[in-house]
């Protein structure tokens, strides 16, 4: 236990952007009834399941990184979405990062994806299935123009819009994060049916993928949901504010990660005490 505490203190003393985290040392899901615990950016998951790597409807990228775990609700969503994509002849759905076996904080790449309810899905739908080499070293397609204000017309495909719309219309989905330029294009193309657009939220990056987030499962009593997105389609002043010049702010100082939810801390303590 002393070694574990000393190791943890050493870890949190490093900048959280680059620090290794103890969650990476948990290589298998924690047994128990599935529970998403805490918030999306400060939580963990019990009873996570691995997304099957073999499917006719989707492919999992970078499987060597073992970020393909999630709450069963997330796996069910991926199956629903990829099945609908196939039935609509959109192409193969490319699955990016989900969560680690017990959730928790990544060393890099994500602040969220911690409670087993987030998944990155790439905004390209290949007609031909990718080879194992392509899956291990996938090449994203940047859909956003260099000025950040619009998508690249030659790269924008109606199948991508249809995929986002299918995801947004899923009852378990609460938010889909995309680049502001992608949200802008969706607003232009949506037509009369705009009810799904309020779930699509502009956010930094996300130029080649969408980040889908599910609601807390009803039986995950320690899971913390976000507030519901504002009413409306989000295509007005809120969206335009993303394209306005921003005044530079003071460089933020280094911050330590917030305290873990007690159940997540207990999970870590029990895991390392057993080693």
Swiss-Prot record:
Record keywords: Disulfide bond, Hydrolase, Metal-binding, Metalloprotease, Periplasm, Protease, Signal, Zinc
Q: Please verify whether the record's keywords include Zinc.
A: yes
Q: Name one GO molecular function term.
A: serine-type endopeptidase activity
Signal peptide location: 1-19
**Residues given in the record as Zn(2+) 2 binding sites:** 147
Binding positions (Zn(2+) 1): 110, 113, 120, 211
Name the needed cofactors.
Zn(2+)
Annotated region Disordered: the residues are 234-262
The UniProt entry's GO CC annotations, sorted and at most eight, read: outer membrane-bounded periplasmic space
Q: What is known about its subunit structure?
A: Dimer.
The molecule here is called Penicillin-insensitive murein endopeptidase
Instruction: Tell me the organism.
Output: Yersinia enterocolitica serotype O:8 / biotype 1B (strain NCTC 13174 / 8081)
Give the gene symbol.
mepA
